[in-house]
């Protein structure tokens, strides 16, 4: 299965595409969609949606996974993040890609085995699980890959359970 993971942010939206059989994962591509804080917010949302649309067209994922909104200290930041997530989810849905949402705790549990893991621990496990020669430098791209791995693992478990139950 091919999975697109998205880690939303108003200035940096991480993305990562993996191929997976549920147990073995391979990175296809990863990166960051960057928008300027000097740009009007509506323009930044448009740039994020356009970039995601292009990534979906280029990599043709079967599934997409997006991290749920965490509880931010700053309400304005949380609201902006919610807008970015809305654009991401709409873009994914318009492309006909099945998507799922996972909390940061679920992603960390799935990838590291500990829901309160540090970012550096997540980065190291992403490197290990994808058999990469080095850690992904961008936390945003690494987080997006972790989200994709989380979904691939959940999807494989769901499919295996469905087969057993008939």
Swiss-Prot record:
Which co-factors does it depend on? Mg(2+)
- What are its E.C. numbers? 3.1.21.10
The UniProt entry's GO CC annotations, sorted and at most eight, read: cytoplasm; Holliday junction resolvase complex
What Pfam families does UniProt report for this protein, alphabetically? RuvC
As its record notes, the protein acts as a catalyst of: Endonucleolytic cleavage at a junction such as a reciprocal single-stranded crossover between two homologous DNA duplexes (Holliday junction)
Q: What is the first-listed, main subcellular location in coarse terms? A: cytoplasm
Active site as annotated: 7, 67, 140
Name the CDD domains for this protein: RuvC (cd16962)
Superkingdom of this protein's organism: Bacteria
Q: Any idea which positions bind Mg(2+) 1?
A: 7, 140
Q: Where in the cell is it found?
A: Cytoplasm
Indicate which residues the UniProt annotation says bind Mg(2+) 2.
Answer: 67
How is its cofactor bound, per UniProt? Binds 2 Mg(2+) ion per subunit.
Point out the coiled-coil segments of this chain: none
| Keyword field | Cytoplasm, DNA damage, DNA recombination, DNA repair, DNA-binding, Endonuclease, Hydrolase, Magnesium, Metal-binding, Nuclease
Which Gene Ontology molecular-function terms are recorded?
crossover junction DNA endonuclease activity; DNA binding; magnesium ion binding
Q: Which GO terms describe its biological process?
A: DNA recombination; DNA repair
Record InterPro entries: RNaseH-like_sf (IPR012337), RNaseH_sf (IPR036397), X-over_junc_endoDNase_Mg_BS (IPR020563), X-over_junc_endoDNase_RuvC (IPR002176)
Q: Briefly, what is this protein's role?
A: The RuvA-RuvB-RuvC complex processes Holliday junction (HJ) DNA during genetic recombination and DNA repair. Endonuclease that resolves HJ intermediates. Cleaves cruciform DNA by making single-stranded nicks across the HJ at symmetrical positions within the homologous arms, yielding a 5'-phosphate and a 3'-hydroxyl group; requires a central core of homology in the junction. The consensus cleavage sequence is 5'-(A/T)TT(C/G)-3'. Cleavage occurs on the 3'-side of the TT dinucleotide at the point of strand exchange.
Q: How does it assemble?
A: Homodimer which binds Holliday junction (HJ) DNA. The HJ becomes 2-fold symmetrical on binding to RuvC with unstacked arms; it has a different conformation from HJ DNA in complex with RuvA. In the full resolvosome a probable DNA-RuvA(4)-RuvB(12)-RuvC(2) complex forms which resolves the HJ.
The protein's name in its UniProt record = Crossover junction endodeoxyribonuclease RuvC
Q: From which source organism is this entry?
A: Solibacter usitatus (strain Ellin6076)
């Amino acid at each position: 299965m091919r999975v697109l993971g998205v880690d939303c942010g108003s200035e940096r939206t991480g993305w990562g595409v993996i191929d997976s059989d549920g147990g073995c994962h391979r990175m296809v591509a990863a990166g960051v969609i960057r928008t300027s804080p000097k740009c009007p917010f509506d323009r930044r949302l448009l740039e994020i949606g356009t970039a995601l649309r292009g990534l979906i067209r280029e990599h043709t994922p079967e599934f997409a996974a997006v991290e749920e909104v965490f509880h931010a200290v700053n309400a304005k930041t949380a609201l902006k993040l919610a807008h970015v997530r809305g654009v991401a989810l709409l873009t994914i849905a318009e492309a006909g890609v099945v998507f799922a949402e996972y909390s940061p705790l679920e992603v960390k549990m799935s990838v590291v085995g500990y829901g309160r893991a540090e970012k550096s621990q997540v980065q190291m496990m992403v490197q290990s699980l994808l058999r990469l020669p080095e850690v992904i430098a961008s936390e945003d791209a690494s987080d997006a890959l972790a989200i994709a791995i989380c979904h691939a693992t959940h999807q494989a478990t769901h499919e295996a359970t469905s087969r057993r139950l008939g």
